[in-house]
Amino acid sequence: MSKNNENIKHQNNDKVNNQVDKKETKNHNKQEFKYKELYEHELKKNKELQNINTLLKDKNQQLEEQISQLNQDFIKQLETKAKQAQQILEQKVNELEARHEAKVNDAVFKIFKFKMEPLLDAINHFTKIVNQNYDDPKIQAFIEGFKMFSQNMIDGLDNLKITKISPQVNDSLNDEIMEVFEVVENTNKPSMHVVEVISDGFKYNDKVIKFAVVKVAK
């Protein structure tokens, strides 16, 4: 009887052990599934983070490229504006210089026109004398010595930007640079053509300060 009890007890122990083993196995499987699920969740989360990180990097690169492009555009605009400003400044400076030069030239022109007429008349008269031909050899030789002096005076005027107006016989009358002293009849020359030059004229910077004086055919 005692042996039977022992067998029964042994069987019960085995049964309990089996149940414990099954329970432990079940718990282990459950725990393993939970870990697996957690691992997969972490993997998924990491992958999502990687995707987000990639997107952020791409977005950051795009922003950097946009900023770089904006900087380049801004620099180009600044350079363009700077060039335009420089051109405007140079234009204004040139305009001011031109105005100043025009005022100076106008002032000099008035001085030459109204203050130098006696000197220009004297130069004309002196030049006419030394350029004439004389029958007396002594007078002609004496006059030759003054021709260089006469030319030096003309060169001096040229240095002041004063140039001679020298009409020629048979030239058509140009009332912009010539002044009629006399209208001559019966000259056999075309009407309003020069028959004699009384005196040369003078210009300063292409503006007449003294008209050439001429006789013309009627």
Swiss-Prot record:
Keyword line: Chaperone, Cytoplasm, Stress response
Span list, region Disordered: 1-32
Annotated GO CC locations: cytoplasm
Keyword Nucleus listed: no
Localization per Swiss-Prot or TrEMBL: Cytoplasm
Entry-linked SUPFAM superfamilies: Head domain of nucleotide exchange factor GrpE (SSF51064)
Example of a GO biological process term: protein folding
Main location: cytoplasm
Molecular functions (GO terms): adenyl-nucleotide exchange factor activity; protein homodimerization activity; protein-folding chaperone binding
First and last residue of the signal peptide: none
Superkingdom in the source lineage: Bacteria
Start-end of Basic and acidic residues biased regions: 1-13, 20-32
Keyword Chaperone: yes
Pfam families: GrpE (PF01025)
Function of the protein: Participates actively in the response to hyperosmotic and heat shock by preventing the aggregation of stress-denatured proteins, in association with DnaK and GrpE. It is the nucleotide exchange factor for DnaK and may function as a thermosensor. Unfolded proteins bind initially to DnaJ; upon interaction with the DnaJ-bound protein, DnaK hydrolyzes its bound ATP, resulting in the formation of a stable complex. GrpE releases ADP from DnaK; ATP binding to DnaK triggers the release of the substrate protein, thus completing the reaction cycle.
Family per similarity comment: Belongs to the GrpE family.
Binding partners and assembly: Homodimer.
Protein's name in the database: Protein GrpE
Species name: Ureaplasma parvum serovar 3 (strain ATCC 700970)
Lineage of the species this protein comes from: Bacteria, Bacillati, Mycoplasmatota, Mycoplasmoidales, Mycoplasmoidaceae
